[in-house]
């Protein structure tokens, strides 16, 4: 069993097919197929179910994936320990929720100071970003917080005011029972705040419509499709143009914090250390 066998196994498990894994690894398909078969023979157990749509892990394959992911992560960290230079460089894989208003400033400041670092940015919802940080798929992520998890450390980024957004200038709380709610999928911090508020008020929304893109939600509100709850900074341009109206909500639900998270046990590269310093400096400036 060689390291590349584990890399091939992980790629097939992630991609769900030999062809996609071969493309990702720049291998010929026959080589990938042979390596997987050899691995199964060596372990004396099938690791994948083969079907027309591709390949999915068996129960033993899922067990194997846990160990392989840890081994490959340890190998990556070993390389980082010996290859990490004093000058930040390499790739930082960062996740973020869509409405971090301070993100452009943080990224711009970091890039100007450390141009040798390649920043790979991935958007997502808070819950899925936490999962990807825990699974070592991301080096860190900006999420709605704070959170409590034994494997995660967090750094304050900003606190923003949440506003109820409607097309009409006037709003009455009873409208929640007659007007659709436009929200992100489950796992969004803003949605959680809104649902908690409605539950406490004993209100049942007429309909919940889920979206993946912030601009789609805001433009739909502007067209009268429904109402939503987002940070005030995210809707400033539409509010200023008079296309939507912002309404304050009870203080208990009216703000949300953004934090940056990373695994406590992951190796701290100079690139990550300098990124955290940039976040800290920016947070300090905002607090002045």
From Swiss-Prot:
GO MF: DNA-binding transcription factor activity; transcription cis-regulatory region binding
InterPro entries: LysR_subst-bd, Tscrpt_reg_HTH_LysR, WH-like_DNA-bd_sf, WH_DNA-bd_sf
CDD domains reported in the protein's UniProt record: PBP2_YofA_SoxR_like
Keyword Cell division set for record: no
GO biological process, one term: regulation of DNA-templated transcription
Keyword Transcription attributed: yes
Portion annotated as DNA-binding: 18-37
Domain HTH lysR-type: 1-58
Record's keyword terms, sorted: DNA-binding, Transcription, Transcription regulation
A Pfam family reported for this protein in Swiss-Prot or TrEMBL: LysR_substrate
Family statement: Belongs to the LysR transcriptional regulatory family.
The protein's name in its UniProt record: HTH-type transcriptional regulator CzcR
Organism, scientific name: Bacillus cereus (strain ATCC 14579 / DSM 31 / CCUG 7414 / JCM 2152 / NBRC 15305 / NCIMB 9373 / NCTC 2599 / NRRL B-3711)
């Amino acid at each position: 069993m060689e390291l590349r066998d584990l890399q091939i196994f992980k790629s097939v498990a992630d991609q769900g097919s030999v062809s996609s894994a071969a493309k990702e690894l720049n291998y010929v398909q026959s080589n990938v197929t042979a390596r997987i078969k050899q691995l199964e023979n060596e372990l004396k157990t099938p690791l994948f179910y083969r079907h027309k749509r591709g390949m999915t892990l068996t129960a033993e394959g899922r067990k194997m994936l846990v160990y392989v992911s840890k081994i490959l992560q340890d190998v990556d960290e070993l390389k980082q320990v010996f290859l990490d230079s004093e000058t930040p460089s390499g790739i930082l894989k960062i996740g973020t929720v869509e409405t971090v208003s301070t993100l452009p400033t943080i990224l711009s400041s970091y890039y100007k100071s450390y141009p040798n670092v390649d920043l790979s940015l991935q958007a997502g919802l808070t819950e899925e970003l936490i999962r990807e940080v825990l699974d070592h798929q991301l080096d860190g992520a900006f999420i709605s917080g704070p959170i409590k998890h034994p494997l995660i450390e967090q750094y304050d980024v900003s606190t923003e005011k949440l506003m109820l957004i409607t097309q009409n200038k006037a709003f009455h709380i009873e409208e929640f029972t007659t007007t659709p709610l436009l929200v992100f999928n489950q796992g969004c911090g803003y949605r959680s705040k809104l649902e908690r508020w409605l539950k406490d008020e004993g209100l049942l929304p007429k309909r919940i419509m889920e979206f993946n893109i912030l601009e789609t939600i805001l433009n739909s509100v502007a067209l009268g499709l429904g109402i939503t709850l987002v940070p005030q900074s995210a809707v400033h341009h539409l509010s200023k143009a008079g296309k939507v109206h912002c309404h304050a909500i009870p203080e208990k639900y009216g703000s949300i914090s953004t934090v940056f998270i990373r695994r406590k046990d992951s190796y701290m590269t100079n690139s990550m250390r300098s990124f955290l310093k940039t976040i800290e400096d920016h947070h300090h400036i905002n607090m002045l």
